[in-house]
Design a protein with these regions (language model features):
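Catalytic-loop of the protein kinase fold
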Residues: 1-13
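Conserved activation segment of eukaryotic-like protein kinases, specifically the C-terminal portion
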Residues: 37-51
Length: 175
């Protein structure tokens, strides 16, 4: 796991044909069973909700969340969730994706920083996320929705993301 994916850690060659990931200072090996890690990782705007809520047991889904926020930012030239504190960040996420319930994310209310006094935003499907995605077609919205799923185990994997219909017809040699 990289644990600090953000635009400034992505290096693109001058011709725009190669992407390299930089700054592995927070990276850790990932294995099963899941290990306990610090929750003080990832730059705020790209931090997954489980990390914001204090989980110390997490997996590669935190990087996929970051990929989703970067994907949005590349297309829209602004961060998807622009919080100014950890609580502000989780509120921005919940306002857009809805406050989770036990049905949508089992065990979320047991996370150390989750407060049942947090506002309860109810969102129908991905309507607010869809409204924010003015520069994506349906496939782009679908990919983003799967990347920034609140429930970590339901986020799309890197392998599945590369096979997503959004990339159908993509030819790297034509970039």
């Amino acid at each position: 796991m990289h644990r600090d994916l953000k635009p400034s850690n992505l290096l693109i060659d001058p011709e725009g044909k190669q992407l390299k990931i930089a700054d592995f200072g927070l990276a850790r090996t990932f294995g099963m069973p899941l290990k306990s890690y610090t929750h003080e990782v990832v730059t705020l705007w790209y931090r997954a909700p489980e990390v914001l809520l204090g989980s110390k047991i997490y997996g590669t889904g935190i990087d996929m969340w970051s990929v989703g926020t970067i994907f949005y930012e590349m297309a829209h030239k602004r961060p998807l969730f622009l919080g100014d504190s950890e609580v502000g960040q989780i509120f921005k996420i919940f306002k857009t994706l809805g406050t989770p319930t036990e049905e949508s994310w089992q065990g979320f209310k047991d996370l150390p920083c989750m407060k049942m006094t947090f506002p309860q935003w109810k969102v129908q499907g991905n309507e607010l996320l869809r409204k924010a995605c003015t520069n994506f077609d349906e496939a782009g919205i679908d990919l983003l929705t799967q990347l920034v799923h609140l429930e970590p185990s339901r986020r799309i994997s890197a392998k599945a993301a590369l096979r997503h219909p959004y990339f159908d017809g993509f030819n790297p040699s034509q970039v």
